[in-house]
From Swiss-Prot:
GO MF, one annotated term: structural constituent of ribosome
Matches recorded under PANTHER family: LARGE RIBOSOMAL SUBUNIT PROTEIN BL27M, RIBOSOMAL PROTEIN L27
InterPro entries named in the record: Ribosomal_bL27 (IPR001684), Ribosomal_bL27_CS (IPR018261)
GO biological process: translation
Protein name per Swiss-Prot or TrEMBL: Large ribosomal subunit protein bL27
Region annotated Disordered, chain positions: 1-22
Keyword field contains Ribosomal protein: yes
Keyword Ribosomal protein: yes
Classification via HAMAP family: Ribosomal_bL27
Sequence similarity: Belongs to the bacterial ribosomal protein bL27 family.
Gene encoding the protein: rpmA
A GO CC annotation given for this chain: cytosolic large ribosomal subunit
Keywords, alphabetical: Ribonucleoprotein, Ribosomal protein
């Protein structure tokens, strides 16, 4: 017979790395071209004028300017970059 108990297993002990999602540039703030405005999962925000969208749905500025949020279609916020 074993004189030590066998090591038990656990179903816990995992934690995923943080993804740092959310709005990175507030409305009215000045951004340069290529700046990330929103990191998101899915299209909570849609790109508007002078804003682009990456393959992971990140919204970024295409030109230097000011960030502007507005209500778009289907209850989605739309993000525009207004030239300064």
């Amino acid at each position: 017979m074993a004189h030590k108990k066998g090591g038990g297993s656990t179903k816990n002990g995992r934690d995923s790395n943080p993804k740092y999602l959310g709005v990175k540039a507030a409305g009215g703030s000045t951004v340069s071209a290529g700046s990330i405005i929103v990191r998101q999962r899915g299209t909570v925000f849609k790109p508007g004028n002078n804003a682009g969208i990456g393959k992971d749905h990140t919204i970024f500025a295409l030109i230097d300017g000011k960030v502007s949020f507005r209500n778009g279609r289907n209850n989605k916020k739309q993000i525009d970059i207004l030239p300064v």
